[in-house]
Amino acid sequence: MALPMVGLLLLLLLGGPGAAITIPPEYGAHDFLQPPELTEEPPEQLVVFPSDDIVLKCVATGNPPVQYRWSREDQPFVPEEHGGVSVVPGSGTLVINATLAARLQGRFRCFATNALGTAVSPEANVIAENTPQWPKEKVTPVEVEEGDPVVLPCDPPESAVPPKIYWLNSDIVHIAQDERVSMGQDGNLYFSNAMVGDSHPDYICHAHFLGPRTIIQKEPLDLRVAPSNAVRSRRPRLLLPRDPQTTTIALRGGSVVLECIAEGLPTPWVRWRRLNGPLLPGGVGNFNKTLRLWGVTESDDGEYECVAENGRGTARGTHSVTVEAAPYWVRRPQSGVFGPGETARLDCEVGGKPRPQIQWSINGVPIEAAGAERRWLRGGALVLPELRPNDSAVLQCEARNRHGPLLANAFLHVVELPLRMLTADEQRYEVVENQTVFLHCRTFGAPAPNVEWLTPTLEPALQDDRSFVFTNGSLRVSAVRGGDGGVYTCMAQNAHSNGSLTALLEVRAPTRISAPPRSATAKKGETVTFHCGATFDPAVTPGELRWLRGGQPLPDDPRYSVAAEMTVSNVDYGDEGTIQCRASTPLDSAEAEAQLRVVGRPPSRDLQVMEVDEHRVRLSWTPGDDHNSPIEKFVVEEEEEREDLQRGFGAADVPGQPWTPPLPLSPYGRFPFRVVAVNAYGRGEHHAPSAPIETPPAAPERNPGGVHGEGNETGNLVITWEPLPPQAWNAPWARYRVQWRPLEEPGGGGPSGGFPWAESTVDAPPVVVGGLPPFSPFQIRVQAVNGAGKGPEATPGVGHSGEDLPLVYPENVGVELLNSSTVRVRWTLGGGPKELRGRLRGFRVLYWRLGWVGERSRRQAPPDPPQIPQSPAEDPPPFPPVALTVGGDARGALLGGLRPWSRYQLRVLVFNGRGDGPPSEPIAFETPEGVPGPPEELRVERLDDTALSVVERRTFKRSITGYVLRYQQVEPGSALPGGSVLRDPQCDLRGLNARSRYRLALPSTPRERPALQTVGSTKPEPPSPLWSRFGVGGRGGFHGAAVEFGAAQEDDVEFEVQFMNKSTDEPWRTSGRANSSLRRYRLEGLRPGTAYRVQFVGRNRSGENVAFWESEVQTNGTVVPQPGGGVCTKGWFIGFVSSVVLLLLILLILCFIKRSKGGKYSVKDKEDTQVDSEARPMKDETFGEYRSLESEAEKGSASGSGAGSGVGSPGRGPCAAGSEDSLAGYGGSGDVQFNEDGSFIGQYRGPGAGPGSSGPASPCAGPPLD
């Protein structure tokens, strides 16, 4: 197809003496003449049916306008001469009515003509067909036996366009196809072997004709398959192709289908192969029965074989494919515009098989008939020399072989045009020294103009060897100098006209790099910076400085930052290379470069096993990049893998060579290896481990360590050891052979090797051996064994059987008094090691206090003291002893913290790992008298309105003879100061004035310090200061009463509301709890018409319940009698209540009698009953630590004695009755009891009860002391 005339590109006529020209758009030739050029052509073949019109398109462009004409069967065809034939206005498209289609079918061609030539269209072959129909035929049933092949024919009507074939049944359901049943390319339905289930009366072949859009169907075929009792299998036989050797023609660029359909029983399977080369995949279809070749090329030429197999035999068919080609373009003739006198050459090179015949025509007339003046053919090309304006024409090149024609139109246009300067005048050019500059002078004219350049000195430019003028008029000046600047002149002319233009050349200084960057070496992960400076010609702006890496722009990476310098942070090996600094202007650029060298740790790869046996391996590997630092060594790491173990990699250093000497391997292991390269910058990264190397099991190479033998019970021996780790087993499992034998012969004859070894094989420790004499030495050893054998011979160790209680006790026990609270005890150990029956662990000193020096024997002992070791038929100690433990082989100890002026006894015993031995004989000693301490605390609490409780505590160092307590009422008009001599550190002062305050003082005896003073009061404390701000009122209802009260806004106090029936003797009952912030409370459950007393009860700081408001409330209504039969009227209930009241009355009487009764007490005895709790080892001795032998019984005694002795607690007796632990709650020790030994007997009465006092006189009270 020809190119448009305006804007046609300049094309070279290859091998020709001339070249076509293109009129530039800016030349302005708007009315330029154009030869005809076809834009729409009729198809090569057109098939029409009775209802279709024949439409043959033919449209062309040209100036002057184009005229159209047609030919039919190479004869002129005039549409106007045929009724029903017309031409579309404005084009050459031919329309033939459908009624004339059958009569006017044939070969048509279109011609488009104007003053410059004639363009010819390809031939269009018009075929008129009738509507396809199947001829009437008589269809007979197809009858076959089971297993026979069947072919159901289709035979559709013939057509220029083959139809698509479908096989369906009468329900319009497709016949299922598979390896046994399939449709061939001819439309027939093939059965490789018939089955009884194939019997159907309605096999219908449908043909779909795409042109007329019609589907027709064949008469149904009745297939009847008779069952057979003797179905025999048979070898395959080809149904298609019918000839075992078939030749197929395939056209280049098209597709071809090769087909093989076979019959046989069982159903054959088809496969394909190419005999003269490989078979490309993807072309097999239709259950392997077809092979399709797409986009056929000459390489597909050859033989293809199909093979049908079914186990009974083989059938083969060969397809010989010959590839041919319709004509196709190798070099197509091109249209062109030429000037007068030029030579034109039009090439027409066509390929095809068979080789096509080429025919040249001029304006649709064969060249032979058009005359040969100034035209000749050369190698298929048409050459036209010395062109003249009247040589303009349209030339046709048509190629043809048996597969069809190929036609191309190319016009030849000869024109004459005056000269026109296309480049603007006075253009300005800038260039840098030593560069090349191009000064343009574009011109156009036909014939082509001649161009000449003049320098600023008006000399021809071509006189300078540095200048060159191109055919398009441009001047090139190379290696420009500073003096080359100035105004240049271009002059052009052709046969019709001439013209000129000027160009200004300015020469600039080059751009230079003033401070080039320096190469750098950086370690991976560091930051590196490059600096660069440049100078620019001041007349050239702007100048730009850019950074590149390897000639490419810097990557889009935040690690690269560019400002006055370039910085690369966290450098990696990929950053290594050439760094360029480029300074550029619109005219030139300068560049300097530096090398970035990144160093780091080297990698290694491709680990391979060179040689391996049971106990060693040799490895090799490929060293990786050394990252600019030579590899110093390789570290070979080995890992052992087992099902029950996986330990980390162990390492071995290898010098620089990439292989290892033999490396040892442990038995029964899987050993992956990896290699790490090392250079001056450290170890490289690990590569993937190698495939594990497995070694067979072997006997253990070592025995377990930590073998120890020791008894944990008398007469046994427990042998333990540290089990081998799994990696030392050398096998899937390991056991232990444990052996033992006595170290000495019976009778102590010394070591002997005559004893046989006893042994036991176990999986894990321990091994326990029983029935042995106590603490006897044994030789023991443990050997590892596994399925491959025994470990090395084990070295025996020594162990001992279990210990027994010692039979020996300390002798020569003596006591040395050091001061009133410390003594030194010494002893020796009797007997020998055999009597010790174990390892000596230490000694225990057991001691206890008997009482004060000089007092009589105790009358009673603490209940159930804990048992201590003692000699037979010997009485136990009176108090639980205190134990001092001394570790090791000691021969003495210090006993400190003893009570002065006291009698003590002690015993010493030895102990081993099993326990304590028998104690020594008891040794008695006495401590000298000590110094009393001052009183430490005096506490006073109110008991009731006329009594106070007094508690005194001090640290005693000797026997106390008494206490002097002074007290005085502090209110105005009070009585004189009173006093009392106390024999007990706790007592009650009774008969005091009610609601009075007293000052009490307790001086020490002798008076080393001022007296200890305090203040007490018999006045009860109010519950809270807010009660004085209460305002209370009440009103009664029928079954309840509402009580309203007011208090300060910030008060939030809870209290109890109590009530009682005023007309009965019932006690106060609690209704509930109220809160001062609620301002009201409602009493519920009252009887109508009844008067009640109501009071509020709060708790003061001493914990007492105190009533702070009382009033009366009257409910409304009358009393309604309750119906009889209630529980309260039952006789059994009245009797039960009476019994409870009687028991409570008896208990109250007994308590009153006990509270009023006086008694005797002995301060001395109470002090004797205390166990000294301050005994502890002295810091200047090294005999060990104390261990108390007091049992839970002692704790229970202490807790029991304190249960009823708290101040103000229920059941508290008078001072004379004894209160053993009355100070225990105040932080004192248990030794706080005071009893007199008979020197003070009876009760002491005070100065007399006050006016408001009541109750019995205090037993603590005595004559007043002034």
UniProtKB/Swiss-Prot annotation:
Instruction: List GO BP terms, alphabetically.
Output: axon guidance; dendrite self-avoidance; homophilic cell adhesion via plasma membrane adhesion molecules
| UniProt keyword terms in alphabetical order | Cell adhesion, Cell membrane, Disulfide bond, Glycoprotein, Immunoglobulin domain, Membrane, Repeat, Signal, Transmembrane, Transmembrane helix
Residues in the Cytoplasmic compartment per record: 1154-1266
UniProt keyword Cell membrane, yes or no: yes
What is the protein name stated in its UniProt record? Neuronal-glial cell adhesion molecule
**Gene Ontology, cellular component aspect:** axon; axonal growth cone; plasma membrane
The protein's topology relative to the membrane is: Single-pass type I membrane protein
Q: Which residues are glycosylated?
A: 97, 288, 390, 434, 472, 498, 712, 819, 1061, 1075, 1100, 1116
At the top level of its lineage, which domain of life is listed? Eukaryota
* Tissue and organ distribution: Brain.
Secretion signal span: 1-20
Q: Which family does it belong to?
A: Belongs to the immunoglobulin superfamily. L1/neurofascin/NgCAM family.
Q: List each coiled-coil range.
A: none
Q: Which PROSITE patterns match?
A: FN3, IG_LIKE
Domain annotation Ig-like C2-type: ranges: 36-128, 135-221, 236-322, 327-413, 418-506, 510-597
Q: Which Pfam families does this entry report, sorted A to Z? A: Bravo_FIGEY (PF13882), fn3 (PF00041), I-set (PF07679), Ig_3 (PF13927)
rRNA processing keyword on record: no
**Bias regions of kind Pro residues — which residues?**
862-881
Disulphide linkage map: 58-110, 154-205, 260-306, 348-397, 441-490, 532-581
- Composition bias (Basic and acidic residues) maps to 1163-1195
Report the GO molecular function annotations.
cell-cell adhesion mediator activity
What spans are recorded as compositionally biased (Gly residues)? Answer: 1199-1211
Side Extracellular, residues:
21-1130
Function, please?
Mediates the adhesion of neurons to neurons and neurons to glia. It is involved in neuronal migration, neurite fasciculation and outgrowth.
Name the species this protein comes from. Gallus gallus (Chicken)
| Quaternary context | Binds to itself and to axonin 1.
